[in-house]
Amino acid sequence: MRLLAAVVIAVLLWGVGLFAFADRVRAITPAPEPAAADGIVALTGPSAERINAAVRLLEQGKGQRLLVSGVNREVRREELRALTPGSSRLFDCCVDLGFDAEDTMGNAQEIAAWARAKDFDSLIVVTSDYHMPRSLLEIRGMAPEVALTAHAVRTPSLDTANWWRSPADARRMALEYNKYLVVLARETVLGLTGRGEAEPQPEAA
């Protein structure tokens, strides 16, 4: 009986946390105009909108350089440049590509290494709305000395206001929440026991 009660309480707490997480995701878009930072980082995803949003911020002078983290190794620089708005000159001079990251933890390692190599103390982080909480948690774990500003991009295929009404949206939100909890637990343990860091280096422009 006690075990059943514990399970019920755990499920209820998880559900409350899920709704709080989803409300946080809903609230971060539309993204407000960010203050300028030393650099801008974009985490790649299923569409080019994250990169496009980051390039627009670079054009507005919101950062000195832009890192696109997690670029597919088969994608050439010229191909990526052709898919993004703005001038080729700006892309050539001020955009760095990171090819080592294969997941969000890899993005965080890549971003931390880039920020240290450039001696940047502040970054604007560009990624999808539902991906932002976990991304910030990962990056803060790898680069706690760097100030982060979130600039979330809305996911057109995800109704963040009514996600529970769609089985697909509910699955996506629950999966991302579970991933967030795993990272939160890991970062809590690492914060108590120490951390070893791997620092993959992004390609210089």
Task: Label the predicted regions.
Residues 17, 123, 133, 180-183:
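Generic signature of intrinsically disordered, low-complexity segments enriched in small/polar residues
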Residues 11, 16-18, 127, 174-177:
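Generic intrinsically disordered, low-complexity segments enriched for polar/acidic and small residues
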Residues 1-31:
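N-terminal type II signal-anchor transmembrane helix
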Residues 117, 202-205:
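C-terminal luminal/periplasmic domains and tails of membrane-associated envelope-modifying transferases
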Residues 9, 158-159, 172-175:
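Alpha-helical structural elements
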Residues 196-197, 204:
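A nucleotide-sugar donor-handling region in carbohydrate enzymes
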Residues 22-167:
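A structural signal for short, hydrophobic/glycine-enriched beta-strand patches
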Residues 166, 170-196:
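A transmembrane-helix-recognition feature enriched in membrane-embedded lipid enzymes
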